[in-house]
């Protein structure tokens, strides 16, 4: 059986979309003839918020877990001074000092093995001194893991794979961009192969580096988690719409919430708009208060994927914002639980202005790549409605609410969703490690 060392900073129990991809590899690779060894950091859910990302680990020793799926090496984590100040005094104090310290470590972590993430390198290096493996894969971000994989590859003569969940240099500011571009090119020189989630990202990454052998392994949903909640029924007494994950600046969330508020005031329905684990909770809560919608709009903190799916299943409709050339990750869970999706928006003037101002990705004038991946997916799977603009949204809400009032649920007759399983992604990675790197 081939043995694959996986460098993954985000990993359960930390609640992170980025951790779901390597977790699926860990869970399913062995079924396809590859034994996974995950090197990550120790995580806790002490705060249930972003503070868990910088909280110190409970143990100062490396913890090794052997399970039926594989091996997990959890290295200790000690926050730097900036993070300790944040934990002790909160986000409003020492902001400039914390920013300077963070920038210092950001600069030094590439030429030197320093900073709070370097424990993964030391843990992997110790393991490799006494254990043989066939390949290394590092999943970014954080992209400093590419440095660790590159160094380990040279030291132990093992091929390494760079897994890009997102492009490395796309969203950097102008001052930082030349610096990270240099290091990206430097570390990728000895990569045996590259994986990423879409042809669009492959193209964007190729704008900065000479691409090695590249394989597209999309994101997806965890089939075991979905199976555990497949008998969960929709709510039948209140029409519930759910949205999960980050709300980005190019998302027309203000427009959508305003239309929702208009619908509530016009029809006085039994309806809820619920947000799970979002990054704009305070803003949306304040909007609800200002518009006397506290009983209709709610926000909930982050939760583990299994609990999130259980909650989503009790809703009738899933809200999805348009990410254009980028598929995102939340759409896969929506597809998996077979709840109707409403995509906002397909062609709304206000949304287009937000896209022009904030959207970080661009395509060349002539390309065969799609600029509406989520819309393509919904059309292929028949899983939802592409809402064209805010006027269309009002009519869609009316139609869906009428269907709910009549039936007590919303029908969803989606098809061809099985191919979006993360287990399929693990199979593709196993095939790559087993044959194409040999």
What are these regions (language model features)?
Residues 386-395, 402-434:
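A charged, aromatic-enriched C-terminal amphipathic alpha-helix characteristic of glycosyltransferases
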Residues 200, 220:
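Carbohydrate-associated surface elements
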Residues 192, 310-326, 339-343, 347:
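Acidic donor-binding loop of glycosyltransferase active sites
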Residues 1-77, 193, 214, 263-266, ...:
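N-terminal subdomain of nucleotide-sugar transferases
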């Amino acid at each position: 059986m081939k043995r694959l060392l996986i460098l993954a900073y985000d990993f359960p129990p930390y609640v992170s979309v980025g951790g779901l991809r390597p977790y699926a590899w860990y869970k399913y690779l062995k079924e396809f003839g590859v034994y996974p060894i995950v090197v990550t950091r120790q995580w806790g859910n002490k705060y249930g918020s972003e503070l868990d990302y910088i909280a110190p680990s409970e143990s100062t020793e490396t913890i090794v877990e052997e399970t039926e799926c594989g091996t997990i090496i959890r290295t200790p984590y000690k926050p730097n001074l900036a993070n300790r100040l944040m934990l002790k005094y909160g986000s409003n104090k020492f902001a400039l000092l914390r920013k300077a310290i963070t920038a210092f470590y950001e600069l030094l972590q590439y030429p030197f093995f320093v900073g709070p993430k370097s424990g993964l390198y030391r843990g992997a290096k110790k393991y490799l001194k006494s254990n043989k493996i066939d390949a290394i894969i590092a999943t970014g971000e954080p992209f400093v893991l590419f440095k660790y994989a590159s160094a380990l590859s040279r030291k132990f003569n093992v091929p390494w794979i760079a897994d890009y969940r997102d492009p490395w240099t796309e969203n950097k500011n102008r001052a930082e961009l030349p610096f990270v571009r240099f290091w990206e090119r430097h570390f990728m020189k000895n990569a045996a192969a590259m994986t990423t989630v879409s042809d669009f990202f492959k193209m964007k990454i190729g704008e900065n580096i000479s691409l090695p052998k590249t394989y597209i392994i999309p994101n997806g949903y965890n089939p075991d988690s979905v199976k555990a909640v497949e008998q969960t029924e929709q709510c039948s007494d209140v029409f519930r719409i759910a949205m999960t994950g980050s709300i980005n600046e190019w998302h027309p969330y203000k427009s959508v919430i305003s239309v929702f508020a208009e619908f509530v005031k016009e029809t006085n329905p039994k309806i809820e708009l619920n947000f799970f684990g979002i990054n704009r909770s305070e803003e949306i809560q304040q909007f609800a208060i200002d518009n006397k919608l506290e009983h209709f709009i709610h926000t909930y903190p982050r939760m583990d994927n299994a609990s999130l799916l259980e909650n989503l299943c009790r809703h009738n409709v899933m809200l999805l914002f348009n990410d254009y050339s980028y598929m995102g990750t939340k759409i896969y869970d929506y597809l998996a639980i077979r709840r109707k999706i409403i995509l906002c928006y397909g062609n709304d003037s206000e949304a287009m202005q937000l896209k022009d101002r904030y959207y970080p990705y661009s395509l060349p004038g002539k390309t065969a790549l799609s600029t509406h991946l989520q819309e393509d997916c919904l059309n292929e799977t028949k899983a939802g409605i592409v809402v064209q603009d805010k006027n269309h949204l009002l009519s869609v809400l009316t139609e869906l609410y009428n269907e709910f009032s009549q039936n007590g649920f919303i029908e969803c007759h989606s098809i061809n969703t099985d191919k979006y399983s993360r287990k399929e992604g693990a199979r593709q990675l196993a095939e790559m490690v087993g044959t194409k790197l040999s």
